[in-house]
Amino acid sequence: VNPADHQPAPGHEIARLLDDVDAYAARLGTSRARLLDVGLISHATGIEPERVRGLLAGEPPEEEPREKNARELFRKALFKERLRFLQRTRLKETFAGREPYGLREISRATGISAQHVSNLLNGERGANHDHAARLEVFFRVPEGFCSRTEGAALIAYLRRMVNEDLPKLATRAVLQELGARSVALRSTADGAQIDTLRDLLPALDELVKVIQGKQSGGAQEGGRERP
């Protein structure tokens, strides 16, 4: 039995994660659109902005073909798209402004010949794991950036939001409501702090209600006239 057969379809997983985003948006008194910046998602995933909008609106993500030859062509085209995206969006600072890196600069930094880099950008060659890793390091993106399908890339982004960023944001909002002026929340390597934050949120919500209830009761008592 292939374990992949028991994994939720990418479209269903994206929908589930978006439901979680909606729940946090309601808690924070905002909207999904305010929490999900299309430009930031595009920059972080390598998916073009228009396609990001489509995926967030429920369009099904493109999946890797099962047939071997079709799968190899798909991976080659995907790598080309991601590499071109990086060359276009990860720019170097120059006196004239921000400019894309040239083939020779990429070649010198990665040890991959300029001709081979050109072939990768044109989709004429596929990249092996070593070349992909060197290029991802050069452009300062996570491992797998150039090979993840759009569904996998968006799922990874949304999971980080739901499991890390939004729990921090929600906890910070509750603590500030409780009167904490400065709240510093840092993630740890094993994610233990984030799990703790998610577990604490319901208790913090109850604490806010208790304090607000006491404040409301005190205000009513103070407003009564003494006999």
Give residue ranges: language-model regions.
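A short, Lys/Arg-rich alpha-helix, primarily the initiator
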Residues: 1-34, 39, 50-103
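Short, basic-rich loop-to-helix N-cap that marks the start of a DNA-contacting helix
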Residues: 31-40, 100, 124-137
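Residues within the helices of the helix-turn-helix
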Residues: 39, 103-108, 115, 133
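Alpha-helical residues within the helix-turn-helix
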Residues: 43, 108, 137
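Short coil turns linking two alpha-helices in DNA-binding domains
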Residues: 48, 102, 113-116, 128, ...
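Short C-terminal boundary/hinge segments that cap the last helix of small helical domains
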Residues: 49-55, 140-157
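Interfacial/linker helices and their anchor residues that mediate assembly or domain coupling
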Residues: 154-227
